[in-house]
Amino acid sequence: MTSKIALFDQTLIASLLQPLSLNQPDFKAYKTKVKLKISEQRNETSGEKELKFEISRSDDFEFLFSETLNNEKYQILARDHDLTVDFDAFPKVIIQHLLCKNIVKNLEEDGEVDARKKAGYHSIADPGKPTEINIILDAEKNFCSFELFSKTPISKGKIFSIKLHAVRGDHLISHLLKICSSQAVKLSTFYKSADELASLRQKCGDLEKQVEKLSGVKEEFEEMSEKFKELEDEVELVKEERENIRLLVEDKEDEVADLKQDTESLQKQLEENQEELEIVGNMLREEQGKVDQLQKRNVAHQKEIGKLRAELGTAQRNLEKADQLLKRNSQQQNQQSLDMRKLGELEADLKEKDSMVESLTETIGILRKELENEKLKAAENMDSFEKLSMENENLKEKIAHYRAQRFSPAPSGLPGLQTGLTNRLTPSFKPVLGPHTPYGANLNSRTPFRDNTTLNFQNSTIATPHAFRFNSQLIADETTGSSVTNTPPAQR
């Protein structure tokens, strides 16, 4: 035999049946891993094609069985087991379809490669039919039977069975030497792997330490990043505050300038208001004197009205007496003309007195109205005086407040605010005194009253026709006597 072609070389799961003793037919069965190797070779003498089946175990070095199958032996095998494929197709069929994934295991830890990962003639067709391998050992371990079964959900059937003989002598020694060399290679590989593992463990420890350090550095970096973000936010806030402060300082400077102008104008207004207040006070005192005089005149008129009423009662009584007298003297023919003349005089006198009473009543009503108007004007003057007093007090408080703020120290951090106060809107007043005022030309003229609806000043003293007539009548009565009561000045 010259050359070999390995068609299949994989570790399979098989059921190993071993007799308990030489004399007992019972078997001990257990699952084990066996390595099946199928190779194709040529006979050196005849050149005939042959298939070599070889099984071994990694945990039992003496477990080595093999059998060479040529065309003649295969025909006997096919006839015994009713095989339908020829000798050339036999290895391909059993490799690709019978040795499926259910029994083929990938044992990369043993240095093998799964047949399903190989391409070509000896690759495994996936999925394949479920199969089972049984290996029956001889009691003396001189041969074994390699049986291949197909499985169904309810039964299993034998496909074929090959009798393998134990390998001994030089072939076994060669097999053991191969195992030793492979084990030596594995051992050296293990040593290298152990050294590499130790170095890797050391590196892993170093890496773990570095990872711990890096985790700490990462946490510090995250903390620093958060602090940096916070600082950036604070910087932005500081920038915004600085800009706001700058704008505020500019506004405050403008407000301070306006406040200076307002303070000066308020000072001037305060002085003018004080002068106006003095004038209004004098005016109120004058008006109060006039009211007192009117009240005195009203009392005198009331007394005169009482006298007139008494005279009216006397006249009525005289009229009644005259009526009685007329009734008494109605029968006297000679006295009729005289009585009629007296009666006419009495009636004329009564009409004159009635007209006088009516005129006095009208005069009293007019005087009462004028008195009420004067009272209202006096009340308005008092209200105006109180308002002016309150405005004067408010202006004094504002000026004191402005002076206090003006001479108080400015807040720290705002140097632009040390020159003045905050701007505030102040109510505007119409000037009363001065060259461009209604009373600027003549300060001795009548002081105006302040209107309730507007801030302009108007003279509220208006002479009515009745008051003018009454005053002229009073002046005439003082010199010539009363024309109404026909009494001299001394008797009034």
Swiss-Prot record:
Disruption phenotype annotation: RNAi-mediated knockdown results in failed centrosome duplication in embryos.
Domain of life, source organism: Eukaryota
Keywords on record: Cell cycle, Coiled coil, Cytoplasm, Cytoskeleton, Developmental protein
A Pfam family the protein falls into: SAS-6_N
One annotated GO biological process: protein localization
PISA domain location: 46-98
GO cellular component: centriole; centrosome; cytoplasm
Subcellular location(s) of the protein: Cytoplasm; Cytoplasm, Cytoskeleton, Microtubule organizing center, Centrosome, Centriole
Entry's free-text remark on domains: The coiled coil domain is necessary and sufficient for interaction with sas-5.
Function: Central scaffolding component of the centrioles ensuring their 9-fold symmetry. Required for centrosome biogenesis and duplication.
Subunit relationships: Nine homodimers form a cartwheel structure with an internal diameter of 23 nM and radial spokes connecting to the microtubule triplets. Interacts with sas-5.
Protein name (Swiss-Prot/TrEMBL): Spindle assembly abnormal protein 6
Native organism: Caenorhabditis elegans
